[in-house]
A protein has these predicted regions:
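Extended, low-polarity segments enriched in aliphatic/aromatic residues
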Residues: 1-196
Length: 196
């Protein structure tokens, strides 16, 4: 990640935002320390142009961005997400090569599965959205046993309850239609097997 950021800064990027949905309350750099990412070290090699954003909620923004899926989508017609994902000129998917039970091999496309925030799509939600939610999206996007707490009903009802092998690949297509990736960089040296 740091090497890629250094290259992007060298080639003129004014700012490089590393964002991910992390299971920590902190929304900024403190969330990334749990995984060993030190913003100061990144900024030393990137001329101060790096920033870290935990996108598990709306974060510092007043509201969520609603991003439509072109063509209506396979299972979702739109996504409500942290605005970091839309206030960008270039979207780079930076991930580890992983194998998944339901998504096959995680490449650049499956890596976008973390975009929908826990605050609207998370398993630890009870009856309403919560900016404090930290949990994964198993019930909404794997098993499809409940809908997310978005401002409108964007899931079209074509999912198969309990069938993550059907649901996950189709949500991956919908996410990639809504958030086209400009560049994919995969770490295929440190791989993860059977992540889920």
């Amino acid at each position: 990640g740091m090497a890629l950021g250094s290259l992007l800064a060298d080639y003129g990027a004014r700012r490089v935002t590393y964002c991910d949905q992390l299971p920590f309350k902190a929304i900024g750099e403190a969330a990334f320390l749990g995984y060993g990412f030190d913003l100061q070290r990144f900024n030393e090699v990137m001329a101060g142009r790096a920033r870290f954003v935990n996108t598990r909620s709306r974060g510092a923004f007043a509201d969520y961005a609603t991003v439509k899926v072109p063509g209506g989508g396979e299972l979702a017609s739109a996504w409500e997400v942290n605005r970091t994902y839309v206030e960008t000129d270039v979207l780079v998917s930076l991930g580890k090569l992983k194998s998944h039970v339901s998504g096959g091999i995680t490449g650049g496309m499956k890596n976008l599965f973390g975009i929908p925030p826990s605050s609207l799509y998370g398993d630890d939600l009870k009856q309403e959205p919560s900016e404090d939610a930290l949990d994964y999206r198993g019930a909404t996007m794997h098993a499809c046993t409940r809908k997310p707490f978005t401002s409108a009903d964007y899931f079209n009802g074509k999912s198969v309850e309990g069938d993550h092998g059907f649901n996950v690949p189709r949500f991956i297509v919908d996410l990639n239609s809504a958030f086209p990736i400009h560049l994919v960089v995969l770490d295929a040296i440190s791989v993860i097997q059977t992540a889920e």
